[in-house]
Structure formats: C-alpha cells, structure tokens
C-alpha cells in the first residue's frame, strides 16, 4: 500500500498492554513518514487494536469494527485493519463475517502491519514509542504473553507463552521515556512476578527494579503481580528507594480453596493470606490493590461469604471486582457450567463493592490533615486533578486540589494538605508546587 499522503486513525481498546502495542505501531509508522489523525472522519485508513478478554470488551471491539466497516463499505476510508487480542482469537470467524476488513492481524504482527502500510519495520527503534498517555506518565511492558493456566483466562491463547524482555532493552526504553519527560513509570505485563523465569527459572523482577530505580524517575509503580512465587525482595527494594511507590497491584481473584484450585491459581487461602501479611509486615506503608471474580461456576453462598469475610479482614486499599465471564478458549468454558445466574453475579458484585467502599472511605479518612505529595494529571480552572503515590493512573483515587491562581500544569508535583475525603476522592489545598 502506498503511504503517500495517507492519514491513519488508530483506535486502541482494552488494557495498558494494548496501549503499548499501539504506541510502538504509531512510532514505527511515523518513522516511515506516515501521518496519524485524532479524528476517524479525517482518516484514509482506520486501525482498530481490539480487546478480547471478557464479553463486554469483545462487544465493544465488535461494535467499533462494525462502525468502521460501514465507513469502508461507503468508501469513506480506503482501508480498514483490525489487530490485537480479539483478532488473534477469532481471526477465522471475523474474516468470514467481515469481508469489509482489509487485513486482520494478531498481537505480534507489528512488522507485517508496517509492511502492509507501505513501510519498513525498524527493529533498532523498537524501544521507541509515541505515547497515547499524558506525557508525564507511561507504561513499561516488561514481558509479552503468559504461561499461567488460569481456568477463566484466554490470554495465553491470544498472546502466547511468557517472553521476558531483556533488562538492557528495558533500561534503554525507560531511559528514552525519562528523556522525553515521563516522570511516572508504571511497570506492567500480564504477570510481572514471572519476569525472567524464561531466562533461568527464577524471577528477575527485583534485578530489573533496582536498575530502573537508579534512573531519575520520580515515581515507579508495580502493577499486575501474580501471588504465586512473588519475590518478597521486591518489597525490600521498594522500601530502600524513595522513587518506588509504596503500592502493589496483586490480583487475588478469590479466597475459597475450592475455587482457587478450580481456577488453577497454584496457591491456596493460607498461602495467599500469608503472602499478603508478609508484604505488609515488610512495608507497613504499602497500599495494596487487588481484583476479584465473583459468580465463578459453582460459587456457593458460603464461598461468597468467605470472600466477603476475607476482604473485611485484609482491608485492601483498592479493589476491583468482575462478574465471572464464561469465555471460549478457556479451561472453565470447556469443563464447567456457567451455573450462577447473572442476577446473582450482579448482586454479589454490588455487595463486595459496597463493602470495599466502606473500607476505602475509612482508609481515606485516615489521610485527612496529612500533607501529601501529588502528581497533577489535569487542570480545570482553579481545580487540579491529581494522584498520590498510592494511586495508579486511570483506576484509583483522584485528589481534587484547590490551586487558586497558582500556575500549576499537568505533570507537576505539588504538596497538598488533605482536608476532606470520600471513598474514592481526596480534597485538598495546594501548599506549593
């Protein structure tokens, strides 16, 4: 495809890992002289990077593809490409149902996409990205794929087995992000715990973290840690380095031994509680985020009550909850019946999140009167929307800061006195920036 004067609109759906893939694609295309637009109506080519994790994400991806196929059918665009997880999992079915799509790509087809766009893939520039996040924070994807066998998840089929990026390349990528103004580095993969196991069957996460902490990022944050074999020396390193946030995102999913075994998580209730207690003992100031699944096949009232009791006792600082989604290409889909009614799933989500809201409100009240360092994400008039080190981008608390007439900009660090709080917001006034 000739790239002369071609304008591309890229829609990136789904998780932060997908965002990084899109950022790499944009940069490789730009190096070949291709131009991107923020408006689909101005584009010659539309690329949709899809998500296929759960039913809602699939539906969103399909709806966006259908809207774009209408443009392709009407001649409003010259080409339509679909990439990402949904495309990887259902390429045959999508090709049969959507002939308007010119090309379908998987999750590791960057070189092929650039070639179809009329460019040449440049492996020496793979560490370069054009950020889709605000310029002051970025994701650092330290591995691709997943080798876990969780019964509810099709990620290994979408993205393949776990492949760690070499530490040297990640250092180079991080250094470039720092040079380009990134102040907060968020370390991600499907499972950061497993980083380096494919090198020599041990976690190298702590080795990597020390290397990154030596760079001059203001904040470094750890997201998506699997409980099994989590390296506790990471928590020691967290305490030793002021620029590593006292924050850990560790999806637990459930606490019932029967359900954890059925989920094929590799860890039981005793091991999970012991790990979380060890983490908090090593670092009393740490804030823990987790994710739960309710309505898993066969989940009884007693097992759900056990989960509620666990959450009430452990008092996670941040918690997200999903109703179980019976996904094709998973072990649970093949072997288990989706026997919990959607109404019950919804009620259980609401009950768990109501409990978590009360915990979060109590935890936030403890911060009232404190002076805290915050990172500003957005400014609207005299109000800045910011985050503490305990809050990851896009998913956690906002700090609403009265900045008066102070010249505060996104990306600024400020000290703020917290005056009021609710479950998911802090309110304060600026001291200095």
From Swiss-Prot:
Known EC number(s)? 2.8.4.4
Molecular-function annotations in GO: 4 iron, 4 sulfur cluster binding; aspartic acid methylthiotransferase activity; metal ion binding; protein methylthiotransferase activity
Subcellular location, record wording:
Cytoplasm
What residues does the Radical SAM core domain cover?
132-362
Q: Which cofactor does it need?
A: [4Fe-4S] cluster
InterPro entries, alphabetized: Elp3/MiaA/NifB-like_rSAM (IPR006638), Methylthiotransferase (IPR005839), Methylthiotransferase_CS (IPR020612), Methylthiotransferase_N (IPR013848), Methylthiotransferase_N_sf (IPR038135), NA-bd_OB-fold (IPR012340), Ribosomal_uS12_MeSTrfase_RimO (IPR005840), rSAM (IPR007197)
GO terms of biological process kind: tRNA modification
Q: What class of enzyme is it?
A: transferase
Binding residues for [4Fe-4S] cluster 2, per the UniProt record? 146, 150, 153
Domain named MTTase N-terminal: which ranges? 6-122
Reaction it catalyzes: L-aspartate(89)-[ribosomal protein uS12]-hydrogen + (sulfur carrier)-SH + AH2 + 2 S-adenosyl-L-methionine = 3-methylsulfanyl-L-aspartate(89)-[ribosomal protein uS12]-hydrogen + (sulfur carrier)-H + 5'-deoxyadenosine + L-methionine + A + S-adenosyl-L-homocysteine + 2 H(+)
Residues binding [4Fe-4S] cluster 1, per UniProt = 15, 51, 85
Record GO cellular component, one term? cytosol
The record's section on Gene3D superfamilies has: Methylthiotransferase, N-terminal domain, Nucleic acid-binding proteins, tm_1862 like domain
> What's in the keyword line of the UniProt record?
4Fe-4S, Cytoplasm, Iron, Iron-sulfur, Metal-binding, S-adenosyl-L-methionine, Transferase
- Annotated TRAM domain ranges read 365-432
Q: How is the cofactor bound?
A: Binds 2 [4Fe-4S] clusters. One cluster is coordinated with 3 cysteines and an exchangeable S-adenosyl-L-methionine.
PANTHER family attached to this UniProt entry? RIBOSOMAL PROTEIN S12 METHYLTHIOTRANSFERASE RIMO, RIBOSOMAL PROTEIN US12 METHYLTHIOTRANSFERASE RIMO
**Task of the protein:** Catalyzes the methylthiolation of an aspartic acid residue of ribosomal protein uS12.
Family label: Belongs to the methylthiotransferase family. RimO subfamily.
Task: Please state what the protein is called.
Answer: Ribosomal protein uS12 methylthiotransferase RimO
Q: Which organism is it from?
A: Prosthecochloris aestuarii (strain DSM 271 / SK 413)
């Amino acid at each position: 495809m000739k790239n002369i004067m071609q304008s591309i609109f890229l829609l990136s759906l789904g998780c932060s890992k997908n965002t990084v893939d899109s950022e790499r694609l944009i940069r490789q295309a730009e190096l070949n002289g291709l131009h991107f637009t923020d408006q689909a109506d101005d584009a010659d080519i539309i690329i949709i990077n899809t998500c296929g994790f759960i039913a809602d994400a699939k539906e969103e991806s399909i709806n966006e593809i259908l809207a774009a196929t209408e443009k392709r059918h009407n001649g409003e665009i010259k080409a339509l490409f679909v990439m990402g997880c949904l495309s990887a999992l259902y390429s045959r079915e999508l090709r049969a149902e959507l002939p308007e799509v010119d090309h379908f790509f998987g999750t590791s087809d960057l070189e092929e996409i650039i070639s179809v766009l009329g460019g040449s893939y440049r492996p020496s520039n793979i560490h370069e990205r054009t950020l889709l996040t605000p310029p002051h924070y970025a994701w650092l994807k330290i591995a691709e794929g997943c080798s876990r066998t969780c019964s509810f998840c099709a990620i290994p089929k979408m993205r393949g087995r776990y492949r760690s990026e070499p530490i040297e390349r990640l250092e180079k990528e991080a250094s470039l992000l720092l040079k380009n103004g990134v102040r907060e580095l968020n370390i991600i993969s499907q499972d950061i715990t497993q980083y380096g196991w494919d090198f020599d069957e041990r976690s190298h996460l702590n080795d990597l973290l020390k290397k990154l902490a030596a760079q001059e990022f203001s904040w470094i944050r750890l997201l998506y840690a699997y409980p099994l074999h989590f390296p506790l020396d990471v928590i020691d390193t967290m305490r030793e380095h002021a620029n590593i946030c006292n924050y850990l995102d560790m999806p637990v999913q459930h606490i019932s031994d029967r359900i954890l075994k059925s989920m094929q998580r590799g860890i039981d209730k005793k091991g999970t509680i012991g790990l979380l207690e060890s983490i908090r003992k090593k670092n009393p100031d740490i804030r823990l985020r987790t994710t739960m699944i309710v309505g898993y096949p066969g989940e009884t009232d007693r097992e759900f009550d056990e989960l509620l009791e666990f959450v009430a006792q452990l008092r996670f600082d941040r918690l997200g909850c999903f109703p179980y989604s019976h996904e094709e290409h998973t072990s649970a889909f093949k072997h288990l019946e989706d026997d919990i009614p959607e109404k019950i799933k919804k009620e259980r989500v609401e009950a768990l999140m109501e409990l978590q809201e009360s915990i979060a409100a109590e935890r936030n009240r403890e911060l009232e009167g404190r002076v805290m360092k915050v990172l500003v994400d957005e400014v609207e008039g005299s109000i800045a929307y910011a985050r503490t080190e305990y809050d990851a981008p896009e998913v956690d608390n906002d700090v609403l800061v009265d900045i008066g007439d102070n010249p505060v900009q996104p990306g600024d660090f400020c000290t703020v006195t917290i005056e009021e709080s609710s479950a998911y917001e802090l309110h304060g006034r600026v001291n200095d920036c």
